[in-house]
Amino acid sequence: MSQSTPTSISAKELHSWLNNQSKQPICVDVREEQELALAALPWKVLHLPLSQSSSWMGTLSQSLPINQPIVVICHAGIRSFNFGTWLLEQNMGYQVWNLEGGIDAWSVEVDPSIPRY
């Protein structure tokens, strides 16, 4: 059965994934530029701000490989959930997770050096 909504992943689970060489996800950050300036993640992410979707929509399939888990991130987990759901609706075979609570949860549960906003 195919996935219809993103699977939730906690900040602690994602931290574990990022430290496990065998399960390296592609992290897609859908926050806006000004949000990245406030709180940047300490690892490589694919930045796809939702307000600029017209600029990256046509190349999305080249940016996201089918064979790697995709974790979508935003501030609180709502925009990322919506984007992850849309991504799954494209029926391209992606495996999509949503960071529960977004970067705010990451700051609270994993890395307090990431500013909360």
Tell me the role of every PLM-derived stretch.
Residues 1-25, 33-69, 78-117:
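Rhodanese-like catalytic fold shared by cysteine-dependent sulfurtransferases
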Residues 73:
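Short, surface-exposed ligand- or partner-binding patches at beta-edge/loop junctions that are enriched
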